[in-house]
Amino acid sequence: MTTTTTIEGMDHFPIIQALCRAAMASPSVAVRRQVERLRDALIAEGDPKQAKALASILDNAEGVQEMAPSRLTISKTSLPGETLSPNTQVPVDRETSTPLAEIIFPRQINDQAPLFGPAITAAIKSLLEEWRDLEALARYDVAPPKTCLIYGAPGTGKTRLATWIAGQLDLPLVVARLDSLVSSFLGTSSRNIGTLFSFANRYRCVLLLDEFDSLAKLRDDPQEVGEIKRVVNALLQNLDSRKDVGLTIGITNHPQLLDSAVWRRFEIQLEVPRPDLAIRQDLTRQFMAPIDAPAAHQRLLAWLTEGATGAEIEALVRTYKRSLAFGGPEKIDLLDVFRHFATLHSGRISDEKKALVFGNQGELLLALHEAQDGKFSTAELAEITGRDKSTVSRQLAAAREKD
């Protein structure tokens, strides 16, 4: 008699899931086919939850693969302007001599694609493809989008995304913070904006305008009503004049503060959300390098950082690495690491997760074991707590009785 053991009955699916995620980080056609077979087998066995987990891994891997580094070579004849060099002098504020911009050249930009979900990835891929052949578009009397507003919570990777886009276009990035362009000298702010745009329009580059909401903050000052009108008008006029010259990217953490006239100037309005669980796991693994941390540790860090930004996840991983440096992987108490982080960064962790971590350990283990977005196995919980599986099983049973 032949006994068939289903994946569902193994209690090791989280490990299989982690192996699939690691394999799909740089997949071959054969690897992808096997993960797809496993997904289909789970569907056939009537386990849609685990099949959905593998489908998410496949979708996210496809997104990262689509955004893999592939610098575009834009013909000099299709994009006007002179070539920027390291010797090019950036414009400065006439009164204070403060530089109005910083130049980042393509060779200084990391080729590693930022990690986002499938929808954001597809949108970015579409933008880059439209810039791939400007001459082909010109034959149909169309052009790629020349203005893009990227908005979202602080730490979600907006600036990194804009920088990476410039690197993929193989163009220098002229970075200007709008708050630094605003001067206390009457009329100087408008002049600074005009000087910045004149500089960017002269050269083949991507213009990045950071801290866009600083104009709205100035607008709240009743003594600055006249000045802010001049500044906003100068900005709108210069955005209009640049639309036929090159790509302009605006970044803001507070889109609700922007004037509607400013919104209309941007052909693309891209919201960068906080990462979901799958992306948090990918970010945790990326930030963990070069350390090969246990998969259970990485999964827990991703699960506990629900609602966190990429920057906050990176900060937690740094705390984890510091603990490793002092204690080593065999001595690290992962829950203590997270408690330490949650104490120092209490505003970055959800109240629900903090209550679990600082509360009864059995209740935390039960929440992990029954997590809707991918339960933790008894073996994983034992690895997280540093206890044997039988002890963990007793803790789970006690927590169920109490519940």
Residue ranges and their predicted role:
Residues 99-146:
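Pre-Walker A (pre-P-loop) alpha-helix and adjacent loop at the N terminus of AAA/AAA+ ATPase modules
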Residues 5-18, 24-30, 40-44, 49-113, ...:
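C-terminal alpha-helical "lid" subdomain
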Residues 172, 202-206, 243-249:
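Loop/turn-to-beta-strand initiation segments
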Residues 208-210, 233-237, 246-252:
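Structural recognition of the conserved hydrophobic beta-strand(s) that form the central parallel beta-sheet
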Residues 144-175, 195-202:
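Walker A/P-loop
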Residues 173-202, 229:
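Short glycine-rich substrate-engagement loop in P-loop NTPases that contacts/grips substrate
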Residues 220-241, 275:
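Substrate-gripping "pore-loop 1 plus following alpha2 helix"
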Residues 260-278:
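A short helix-turn-beta junction within AAA+ P-loop NTPase domains corresponding to the substrate/partner-engaging
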